[in-house]
């Protein structure tokens, strides 16, 4: 990257690593640019947050490209991942441990595929409590981490497609382990290291559904997982998520980011 790139503005397609916040990725790039180009002040930001436990395309805008953030956030997004059926977590992913089990014996492959089709189109979803959506001027996750329950207004989102690509463990009668065995000891995990050591553990006998979703701005895939479980008459949470594409930007053009090494622009 050169000073001319900063002057013109540049969009970096980053493959966000597992366990990193979007802010951590931006901060790493920011300090590397400062060090390499000797800049003290310049604009930098990302177009569309990715959850810490998700990986994939994160668009980092540098210089004049920050003016395009709103435009880039509006690009259609493609996600792949896995939904676990028969259990829930408070945050709808593995940031927290399983808090309840639900029946799955009635769930069939045809029911799963038929239910996925019901999510295609313009739908309403309620963002997770563990999210950056604001409630009375405060981020929802601030209330969630304090144990407060607040009402988050539903919002309309657009789903172009919801494809089921694989189904595993359907019809398993294996008993699930006690809830107390499914979380890492809190004393072993500091707040700083929370995302590098997720609290939730997936019991291998629970049904798992791999998917591919194409959707519009503001869609929470964690909320889709929660709502998918409810629509199946059970519970569900997201166990993995990868963003494959945002608009014209895809993983095939992405830059890798790692701890302890510089980013190759």
Predicted regions and their residues:
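Catalytic/RNA-binding core of pseudouridine synthases
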Residues: 1-265
């Amino acid at each position: 990257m050169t000073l001319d790139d900063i002057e013109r503005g540049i969009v970096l397609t980053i493959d966000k690593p597992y366990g990193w916040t979007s802010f951590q990725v931006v901060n790493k790039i920011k300090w590397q640019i400062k060090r390499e180009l000797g800049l003290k002040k310049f604009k930098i930001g990302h177009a569309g947050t990715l959850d810490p436990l998700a990986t994939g395309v994160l668009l980092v805008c540098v210089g004049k490209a920050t003016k395009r953030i709103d435009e880039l956030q509006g690009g259609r997004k493609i996600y792949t991942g896995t939904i676990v059926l028969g259990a829930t977590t408070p945050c709808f992913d593995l940031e927290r441990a399983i808090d309840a089990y639900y029946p799955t014996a009635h769930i069939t492959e045809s029911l799963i595929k038929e239910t996925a089709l019901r999510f295609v189109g313009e739908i309403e979803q309620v963002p997770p409590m563990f999210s950056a959506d604001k409630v009375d001027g405060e981020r929802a996750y601030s209330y969630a981490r304090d144990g407060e329950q607040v009402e988050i207004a539903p919002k309309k989102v657009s789903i172009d497609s919801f494809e089921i690509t694989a189904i595993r463990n359907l019809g398993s009668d294996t008993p699930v382990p006690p809830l107390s065995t499914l979380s890492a000891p809190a004393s072993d995990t500091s707040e700083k290291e929370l995302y590098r050591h997720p609290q939730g553990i997936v019991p291998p006998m629970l049904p798992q559904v791999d998917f591919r979703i194409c959707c519009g701005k503001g869609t929470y895939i964690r909320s889709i997982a929660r709502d998918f479980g409810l629509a199946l008459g059970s519970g569900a949470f997201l166990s993995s998520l990868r963003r494959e594409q945002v608009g014209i930007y895809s993983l095939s053009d992405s830059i890798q980011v790692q701890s302890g090494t510089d980013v190759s622009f």
